[in-house]
């Protein structure tokens, strides 16, 4: 597993942070990537968010349920990092651990064997072995001062029989 730590200024648009943009440029292979929480600036071909600039404007879990299994080259998983951020969207279920687990189960179902899940947040949990994924890379992006690091994990779907 490759573990890196880099420093960069924080930005509300995760994918514009230089070390993260570089990671995505290296890791995104194929032309069928999905981003259920895209916001702005997502490199995925299929984007969804509650903001108007996304291709689709649906609840992320409902959006993920629409895809066929074992098809996507990869999924970018960059949900709101905290309950406070999640509540800004006004959806009560965003503060439920079950909601996030259900999203991860759908992501595991959608990604094809050998495909990637690239997750962003304040922890390194990713999708995990119990969903058939093996972590290959961790990028810690330090922002200094009182700002939490952004943690990026790259996982490969190595066992398609364990999707949840």
Question: Model features per residue range: what roles?
Answer:
Residues 1-164:
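Class I S-adenosyl-L-methionine-dependent methyltransferase catalytic core
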């Amino acid at each position: 597993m490759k573990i890196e730590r880099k420093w960069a200024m924080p930005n509300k648009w995760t994918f514009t942070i230089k070390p993260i943009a570089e990671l995505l440029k290296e890791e995104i292979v194929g032309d069928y990537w999905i981003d259920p929480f895209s916001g702005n600036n997502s490199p995925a071909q299929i984007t969804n968010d509650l903001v108007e600039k996304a291709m689709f404007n649906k609840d992320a879990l409902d959006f993920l349920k629409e895809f066929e299994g074992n098809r996507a080259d990869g999924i970018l998983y960059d949900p709101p990092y905290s309950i406070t951020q999640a509540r800004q969207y006004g959806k009560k279920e965003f503060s439920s651990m079950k909601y996030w687990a259900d999203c991860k189960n759908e992501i595991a179902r959608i990604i094809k064997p050998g495909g990637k899940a690239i997750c962003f947040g304040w922890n390194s949990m990713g999708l995990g072995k119990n969903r058939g994924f093996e972590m290959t890379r961790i990028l810690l992006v330090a922002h200094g001062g009182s700002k939490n690091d952004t943690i990026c994990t790259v996982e490969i779907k190595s066992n398609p029989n364990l999707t949840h």
